[in-house]
């Protein structure tokens, strides 16, 4: 028969050291995997497995059916929220800045009940690849754009500048391939080939202005040529648009090309300092109706140009039109509204005086506007206050995300600096927003709860050398901290026991004596209080 006492007596201290070291190694591996999973997905792997798999298995099939019913209702409520997105709570705050607004690209789907998805939008102020992004690459040897971002741009260009009527037209088929080409030199070569076949291929001029032109003046020159070609094509297709679906599609394509070229020309004028000309072109474009307008958000270009002109009254008029509860919000709208209200009080604002006498109605209105803007996008103040370095903005942004904050601050930081005291007011008040939002992922104040999908989408949009801003700041789960402590403690014990077996044995005996002493004392007290023959007396009763 197997004798356990004899087996235990044959075990040497090396066995216990090896056992402790093995458990420490396993704990360390679990810790490393858990930390990696948390950094990548923002949640504990063991916690997710426990909630999603182990708990339903322990609770039985009823719990599983309840869970599936609950997720079904969550999905339906999410769909309902999506269909009614612009109606309340600030007109759409989460991921896409309000569901139902056209032009967003679905990036990440979530299971939340408030906002079912995150939308990726075109950056209204996106830079020129050749004249701006390429020069940054030459200076730093760092890629300013990610393949994901450029792939979204290729999809946009194919949507805007192609149609069914392009079939069997060699120049347009070349351009369809050119938009998808990863090599910039090959894209430029394809555009030149398309122009050799047809000198009136406007999309080819657009690609050359975006990528081949090394200065803004060169880009403007190419775009002016493209504008003449686009106007000719537009008039031709306008005359034949009623001849069928294909002809109508060609007219829509030519309209998109014309509007895009005019917008880029206006942006060139803005960059070259021709502010009045740029403002007039942007105003004319905002009066257009085609569906591409909801994607380009040209009113944000107009707002930025008016701020550069310090035409604050005109900015108020633009905000009165677009800062509406039924329209999707953006950092430009929210922070421009805060800037204009701060402008009225910022030059005289003092935190010491305000703490003594309280805030005036105008100061209170400015502070509330700042809190509203910070709730919509909490990443912007770090860039405006220059506590975090700016990089070139991406071609696409995620509303309420770090990418939108970068795009806004990159172009609007100087406007905040132009208003005396505005940054000081922002510095003194912006963190007060978080006291009103103890659980931003669960409940918002003026907007939807902050979407959980922003971090993953921003990591796809922003280059690897940029540290993505995360909100709210995630704390390490208790399990990771516990595992780290247990792993370190057991590894230390194994090392000390291996090096100093006798002292560690005496230490272990002393610790066990200290731990057992309270229990021995409690046992003596109980025996002194209760008589030894208590059971006999109870049996007699």
From Swiss-Prot:
Family to which this protein belongs: Belongs to the ST7 family.
Main location: membrane
Biased composition (Gly residues): 84-105
Annotated signal peptide: none
Keyword Transmembrane helix assigned: yes
Descriptive protein name: Protein ST7 homolog
Region: Disordered, residue numbers: 62-116
UniProt biased composition (Low complexity): 67-83
GO cellular component: membrane
Disulphide bonds in the chain: none
Family matches, as Pfam families: ST7
InterPro entries for this protein: ST7 (IPR007311)
Spans through the membrane: 15-35, 476-496
Membrane topology classification: Multi-pass membrane protein
Subcellular localization(s) per the UniProt record: Membrane
Keywords for the protein's UniProt record, in alphabetical order: Membrane, Transmembrane, Transmembrane helix
Protein's organism: Drosophila pseudoobscura pseudoobscura (Fruit fly)
């Amino acid at each position: 028969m197997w004798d356990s006492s004899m087996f235990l007596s044959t075990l040497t201290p090396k066995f216990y050291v090896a056992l402790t070291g093995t458990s420490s190694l396993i704990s360390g591996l679990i810790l490393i995997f858990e930390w990696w999973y948390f950094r990548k997905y923002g949640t504990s792997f063991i916690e997710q497995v426990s909630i999603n798999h182990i708990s339903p298995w322990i609770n039985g099939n009823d719990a599983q059916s309840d869970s599936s019913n609950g997720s079904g209702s969550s999905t339906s409520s999410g769909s309902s929220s999506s269909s009614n997105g612009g109606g309340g709570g600030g007109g759409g705050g989460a991921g896409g800045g309000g569901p139902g607004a056209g032009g967003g690209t679905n990036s990440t789907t979530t299971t939340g009940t408030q906002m079912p998805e995150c939308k990726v939008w075109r950056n209204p102020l996106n830079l020129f690849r050749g004249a701006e992004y390429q020069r940054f690459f030459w200076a730093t040897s760092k890629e300013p754009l990610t393949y994901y971002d450029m792939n979204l741009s290729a999809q946009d260009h194919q949507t805007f500048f192609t149609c069914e009527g392009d079939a069997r037209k060699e120049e347009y088929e070349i351009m369809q391939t050119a938009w998808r080409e990863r090599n910039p030199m090959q894209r430029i070569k394809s555009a030149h080939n398309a122009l050799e076949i047809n000198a009136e291929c406007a999309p080819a001029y657009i690609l050359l202005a975006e990528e081949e032109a090394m200065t803004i003046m060169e880009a403007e020159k190419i775009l002016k040529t493209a504008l003449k070609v686009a106007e000719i094509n537009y008039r031709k297709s306008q005359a034949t648009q009623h001849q069928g679906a294909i002809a109508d599609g060609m007219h829509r394509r030519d309209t998109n090309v014309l509007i895009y070229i005019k917008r880029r020309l206006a942006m060139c004028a803005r960059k070259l300092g021709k502010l009045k000309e740029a403002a007039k072109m942007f105003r004319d474009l905002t009066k257009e109706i085609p569906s591409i307008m909801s994607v380009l958000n040209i009113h944000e270009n107009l707002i930025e140009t008016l701020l550069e002109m310090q035409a604050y009254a005109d900015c108020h008029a633009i905000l009165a039109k677009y800062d509406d509860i039924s329209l999707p919000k953006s950092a430009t709208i929210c922070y421009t509204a805060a800037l204009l209200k701060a402008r009225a009080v910022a030059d005289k604002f003092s935190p010491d005086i305000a703490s003594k006498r309280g805030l005036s109605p105008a100061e209170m209105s400015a502070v509330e506007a700042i809190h509203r803007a910070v709730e919509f996008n909490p990443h912007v103040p770090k860039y405006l206050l220059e506590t975090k370095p700016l990089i070139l903005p991406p071609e696409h942004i995620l509303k309420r995300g770090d990418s939108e904050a970068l795009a806004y601050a990159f172009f609007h930081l100087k406007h905040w600096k132009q208003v005396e005291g505005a940054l000081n007011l922002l510095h003194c008040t912006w963190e007060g927003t978080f006291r009103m939002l103890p659980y931003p992922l669960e409940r918002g104040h003026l907007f939807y709860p902050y979407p959980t999908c922003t971090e993953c989408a921003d990591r796809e949009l922003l280059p690897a050398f940029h540290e993505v801003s995360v909100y709210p700041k995630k704390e390490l789960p208790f399990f990771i901290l516990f595992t780290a402590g247990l792993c370190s403690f057991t590894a230390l014990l194994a090392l000390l026991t291996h090096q100093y077996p006798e002292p560690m044995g005496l230490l272990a005996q002393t610790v066990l004596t200290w731990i057992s002493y309270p229990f021995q004392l409690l046992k003596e007290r109980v025996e002194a209080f209760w008589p030894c023959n208590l059971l006999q007396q109870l049996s007699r009763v």
